Design a protein with these regions (language model features):
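DNA major-groove recognition helix of helix-turn-helix/homeodomain DNA-binding modules
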Residues: 42-58
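Short, charged recognition helix plus adjacent turn
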Residues: 56-78
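Residue-level signal for the short linker/turn that defines the boundary of a DNA-recognition helix
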Residues: 3, 13-15, 39
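Short alpha-helical DNA-recognition segment
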Residues: 13-31
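Key DNA-contacting residues within the recognition helix of helix-turn-helix
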Residues: 6, 31-32, 45, 59
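The DNA-recognition helices of helix-turn-helix-type DNA-binding domains
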Residues: 26, 37-38
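N-terminal-biased segments
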Residues: 1-7
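The alpha-helix within a helix-turn-helix
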Residues: 9, 20, 48
Length: 78
């Protein structure tokens, strides 16, 4: 997962340092996530927001059927 996150950040001309700042987390905290490859849904939703992309589930025809966004974090208190 870490490679995909880094790849998206690179495509969007950003990096892990900017992601840490965007999420109000310390650089060591993000470095630990990278080392452990321990990303959660909240991390991915915030990454999507930062990179102006969408996080979704696609059906077998590649049609989006569910989108995840910050409202989902509020509903679940994550």
């Amino acid at each position: 997962m870490t490679d995909k996150i880094k790849g998206l950040l690179e495509i969007k001309k950003s990096g892990i340092t900017e992601y840490a700042k965007f999420t109000n987390r310390s650089q060591p905290n993000i470095s630990n996530k990278i080392k452990r490859d321990s990303w959660n849904v909240k991390d991915l939703i915030l990454l999507a927001k930062m990179t102006n992309t969408k996080l979704s589930f696609l059906d077998e025809d590649n049609q989006p059927i569910i989108f995840l966004n910050e409202k989902d974090l509020e509903e679940n208190n994550d």
